Amino acid sequence: MAKGKELKGRIRSTENTRKITRTMEMVATSKLKRATDRVAAARPYALALGEVLSHVYSPELADRFPLLRRPAAPRTVALVILTANRGLCGAFNANLIKEARSRIAELEAKGLTVELHVVGRKGVGFFRYVNRAIASQRTDITDKPSAADAASLIDGLMQRFAAGSIDAVYITYAKYLSALSAPPATEQVLPVAPPTAKAEGGVQHDFILAPSADAILEALLPLYVRNAVYRALVETEAGFQSAQRTAMKNATDNATELLQVLKRTYNSARQAQITQEIAEIVGGASALQG
């Protein structure tokens, strides 16, 4: 009955694992709802900022604002890479790192020096493992990213860009499209590229600019950049929760299938053992009668 005991042990272990993965799936589902609510709340604000900026901006103003500066001969760029602090999310982190490495290779092929600013333990751990220099790292951003997190992440880079010590800032993140799709993407954050469309859906709005276009643009540009980073943070978090929910659901389903196989195998082994014991008893009784 050694095989039967071994199977019972595997059944208990698999049942315990299924309880854990099912619980993690439920937690991820709950967190995903909150994360998608933050994504939905961030998008209208981003559209409104973009609409106002498109009305205020004009090419003749560009030379007066450092965040609009486009260096003629860029030398150094910063790449902000968003990853998760945790795993158990399928290929989510691996895909983000793959996207980042692809962009790094692309930028370096143009002769640019690329500074890495990595968010998340998984990204930090990977680039340390491959001995890639990291200019800054953050592992303290929680699963509820805030506007303050975005400001603390980008404000220093904005100051350096305005001072001319870096010539562009890019961000690699998970672009949340739906619960089933959050592909990795890289976007340029600095210099700011003002939206060209005057308004969404072809609707035009007239603005009265006060005190002046310059004053509005000076206040608006940092908000626009911070909001772009905040949106990347909340979309990446939503993508992570979606990936973890999917991974844990798959693990739960696999555990259920394995349990069915193990129980069938155990029942077959138990049945064979009982049949053998009956045969031995019958054989022994027949021998005594004989």
Swiss-Prot record:
GO terms for cellular component: plasma membrane; proton-transporting ATP synthase complex. GO terms for molecular function: ATP binding; proton-transporting ATP synthase activity, rotational mechanism. The keyword Transport applies. It is a peripheral membrane protein. It is found in: Cell inner membrane. GO terms for biological process: proton motive force-driven plasma membrane ATP synthesis. Keywords: ATP synthesis, Cell inner membrane, Cell membrane, CF(1), Hydrogen ion transport, Ion transport, Membrane, Transport. InterPro entries: ATP_synth_F1_ATPase_gsu, ATP_synth_F1_gsu, ATP_synth_F1_gsu_CS. PROSITE patterns: ATPASE_GAMMA. Belongs to the ATPase gamma chain family. Produces ATP from ADP in the presence of a proton gradient across the membrane. The gamma chain is believed to be important in regulating ATPase activity and the flow of protons through the CF(0) complex. F-type ATPases have 2 components, CF(1) - the catalytic core - and CF(0) - the membrane proton channel. CF(1) has five subunits: alpha(3), beta(3), gamma(1), delta(1), epsilon(1). CF(0) has three main subunits: a, b and c. This is ATP synthase gamma chain.
